[in-house]
A protein has these predicted regions:
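Extracytoplasmic/secreted envelope proteins and their assembly/folding machinery
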Residues: 55-58, 178, 182
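Residues that scaffold the ATP/ADP-binding catalytic core of kinase and kinase-like folds
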Residues: 101-102, 131-132, 184
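Alpha-helical transmembrane segments of integral membrane proteins
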Residues: 1-4
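Hydrophobic, regular-secondary-structure patches
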Residues: 9-90, 112-113, 117-118
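Cytochrome P450 core scaffold surrounding the K-helix E-X-X-R motif
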Residues: 98-106
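Hydrophobic secondary-structure segments that place a key small or acidic residue at a functional site
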Residues: 73-76, 85-95, 107-179
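Short, charged/polar surface micro-motifs in flexible loops or helix N-caps
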Residues: 39, 96-98
């Protein structure tokens, strides 16, 4: 009985450790930096809370002792179109090289992760790929609103399909290079 309790306790502890690590490596990081007011009002208007001079802030943080890596992400929402249908998505602009360096809890089920050479590449969640019948090599159009309310769109090539620990995330998530997200928005 005691051995069973100890083993099940260890199993539960391991599940929590893996959940924490996959959340850190897939979505949030250990620490997030954002402008004052973002946590209260930024969910409604995230583009109003963009960080001024992000490269300078990243350099300052990276120079701190015990900091191993700093990377930027830009979250946005929009529509992904395969030429036949639209799907509402949540998007992240990422720094592909730094993502690869840090490691991630994203598992590729088709294709590959984004690389620095993929200026207009996109990786999509497994649910997104299924809903729009996407495979690597397909082209999609990503549509989003700019901060001043205009609608912008860019074409991307699907370079990979990923899976995370969260099916809900995979059903709506896409990742593009940070520069592409900045151009889109």
């Amino acid at each position: 009985g005691v051995v069973g309790i100890i083993l099940s306790g260890g199993f539960v502890e391991d599940v929590f450790v893996q959940l924490r690590e996959s959340t850190i490596r897939s979505h949030l990081g250990h620490i997030q930096v954002y402008r004052a007011g973002y946590s209260e009002l930024g969910r409604r208007d995230p583009l109003a809370y963009l960080i001024e001079e992000p490269a300078t802030i990243a350099q300052d943080i990276e120079s701190l002792p015990n900091v191993e890596a700093v990377m930027a992400r830009l979250s946005f929402s929009g529509l992904l179109n395969n030429g036949k249908a639209d799907l509402p998505i949540i998007g992240e602009g990422i720094e592909p090289g730094k993502e690869a360096e840090l490691g991630t809890a994203v598992s590729m089920v088709q294709g590959r992760m984004l690389g620095d050479e993929d200026a207009y590449g996109v990786v999509v969640g497994q649910g997104v790929a299924a809903a729009l019948k996407l495979s690597t090599g397909d082209f999609v159009t990503l549509v989003s609103s700019t901060p001043d309310g205009a609608v912008n769109s860019l074409e991307f090539e699907v370079v990979g399909v990923f899976r995370t620990f969260s099916k809900d995330f995979d059903d709506r998530a896409v990742r593009i290079p940070l520069a592409g997200a900045q151009e889109l928005l």
